[in-house]
Amino acid sequence: MITLDALNEYDALTVWKSHLAGVIEENPFMQKDLDNIKTDPKAFQRLFEQVTNRWISGEHDRESAPRWKDFKARVTKGLRTIMDGHGPGSEIAVVTSAGTISVVMQQSLGLSDKKTLELSWQILNSSVTRFRYNGDRIALSGFNDISHLDATGNSDFLTYR
């Protein structure tokens, strides 16, 4: 087993702290969601979507905060390290998070940043996504498979965060 920091999730807490005030300033009506964040899970999701949309736009980048383009570059480098180290046809398991998976999906499907972010909201914890690599490109071969969780009969295992 090896560990590649390049495939770690983005620092969501720092992204949140870096962009939340701007989201509220640009959308004052969202203050209500912030006020209800501890009692309404949907309020958090609405705010977090706005925070991450602001983040991926790149229009509010600061040196002191993570940048979307840097996250994508890091994941791409990590993916390249795996592909170069194992070659086409190898079977490799990578355990990571929705943000990282969505960036690889973006590369394999040619998605925009916005669609990539939207896709990331659909990725279930512990789901399995499969890719194939032929030496030139990476292609999606399965997405968000939860059959191993369904087999337990316990829907409590189906979570998004």
Residue ranges and their predicted role:
Residues M1-A6, K32, F44, F48, ...:
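Conserved histidine-centered catalytic loops in small-molecule metabolism enzymes
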Residues M1-E49:
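Phosphate-coordination/substrate-recognition cap region in phosphate-metabolizing enzymes
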Residues I2, S112-R137:
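Domain-level recognition of soluble alpha/beta enzyme cores
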Residues A12-S18, Q107, T152-S155:
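Short aromatic-enriched loop/helix-cap "lid" or pocket-rim segments at secondary-structure transitions
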Residues I56-D70:
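Surface-exposed cleft-lining segments at the edges of enzyme active sites
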Residues I82-S90:
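Glycine-rich phosphate-binding loop signature in dinucleotide/nucleotide-binding domains
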Residues S90-T96:
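Beta-strand elements within well-structured catalytic alpha/beta cores of enzymes
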